[in-house]
Amino acid sequence: MRTTTWAAWLSAKRRRSTEMAVPAPAQAVQAFDTRTFRDAVGRFATGVAFVTAAPAGEPAGLIVNSLASVSLEPALVSFCPSRSSLTWSRMRRARRFGVNVLGRQHQRFAVRATPAGADRFAGLEWELGRGGVPLLTDALASLECEIVAEHPAGDHWIVVGRVDDLRVSPINEPLVFLAGAFRTVQYGQS
């Protein structure tokens, strides 16, 4: 009868699970094009936010649908701007940004503000938050953040921000992005 110590058994188990968890080398050929990939992930409904900053005192912003909460303690959020975004290359110099969660009332604004070069603050009511970032007065929620990390990820950046301040408005219909279009969701429907 073979006896195994707990430490030896655990060590062997960890070694096996590590060996199984190691992904294959990145030599696989992608069997789909970017349009098909975009259509696939477009089936996942996301919220829409207007990320803002004030580099050199000038308001700048971009529409994102990649906002995610990362951590509660400390409070962290992330979003993913394109690495080719000229707006983000300016905004990142401020080291602070605002996140404005958009609602139904922002649908026309989101469509208008999405193209590069658009005057993204035209017709908006906004004010500077405590940390000096532009915040929409009618956002469903507004967060003031400091950049704590930025990681390259393919053709985008993953930006992580620590939330320093926030405000939440009464519940309203959120703006969502689904299948390549801005849409709204009504509360109370099943």
Regions found by a protein language model. Name each.
Residues 2-190:
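Basic, polyanion-binding surface patches
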